[in-house]
Amino acid sequence: MAEGDNRSSNLLAAETASLEEQLQGWGEVMLMADKVLRWERAWFPPAIMGVVSLVFLIIYYLDPSVLSGVSCFVMFLCLADYLVPILAPRIFGSNKWTTEQQQRFHEICSNLVKTRRRAVGWWKRLFTLKEEKPKMYFMTMIVSLAAVAWVGQQVHNLLLTYLIVTSLLLLPGLNQHGIISKYIGMAKREINKLLKQKEKKNE
């Protein structure tokens, strides 16, 4: 057991080090984005919503086709991938990194690796379910996809995408400030109250 844990830890450390090396040119930008997403200042949440709203308003006004939209998005990613490693050191000054910044960059890369591992783990579980319980897999997939299709039919595509993107960008800050755990705790307490009331009525 201990040997397996050590092997997993070593593999995680190796993957994290590899990712750090790949993203070294994005280090300054990632640290700045991390501060924004974790709401280190009070005006960061409205700034996030304002920028996202502006981008989606531009998309709504231009109304590009799917092919044009995908092409522009990929072109933007290619430009960012080329320009950011060149311009970031000149703007932020990578030589001025502190130990705290280096540690935070390591934590960000480690969290990204863990998130990727979770996604791969869920994907493998899905295929395991398909092999071991094909009927349950089939019903789960049909019901889930039907629900997603119904939501997509009821809500405009652009509005739905806007809500998803905004929620994902606000999620780290909500988690950092304990807002998610707070409301989950409130929901659990309310559910427990309802269950206790139901038990009393049955008695």
Swiss-Prot record:
Residue spans, topological domain Lumenal: 63-65, 176-203
Annotated transmembrane regions: 42-62, 66-86, 134-175
Keyword Metal-binding in annotation: no
GO biological process, one term: cotranslational protein targeting to membrane
Membrane topology note: Multi-pass membrane protein
A cellular-component GO term for this protein: Sec61 translocon complex
Residue intervals on the Cytoplasmic side: 1-41, 87-133
Compartments it resides in: Endomembrane system; Endoplasmic reticulum membrane; Endoplasmic reticulum
Keyword entries, A-Z: Apoptosis, Endoplasmic reticulum, Membrane, Transmembrane, Transmembrane helix
InterPro entries per record: ER_autophagy_membrane_reg (IPR052114)
Keyword Kinase assigned: no
Highest taxon, organism lineage: Eukaryota
Major subcellular site: membrane
Domain characteristics, as noted in the entry: The transmembrane domains are required for its ability to shape the endoplasmic reticulum membrane into tubules.
Role of this protein: Positively regulates SLC1A1/EAAC1-mediated glutamate transport by increasing its affinity for glutamate in a PKC activity-dependent manner. Promotes the catalytic efficiency of SLC1A1/EAAC1 probably by reducing its interaction with ARL6IP5, a negative regulator of SLC1A1/EAAC1-mediated glutamate transport. Plays a role in the formation and stabilization of endoplasmic reticulum tubules. Negatively regulates apoptosis, possibly by modulating the activity of caspase-9 (CASP9). Inhibits cleavage of CASP9-dependent substrates and downstream markers of apoptosis but not CASP9 itself.
Subunit structure: Homooligomer. Heterodimer with ARL6IP5. Interacts with ATL1, TMEM33 and ARL6.
Family of this protein: Belongs to the ARL6ip family.
Official protein name in the record: ADP-ribosylation factor-like protein 6-interacting protein 1
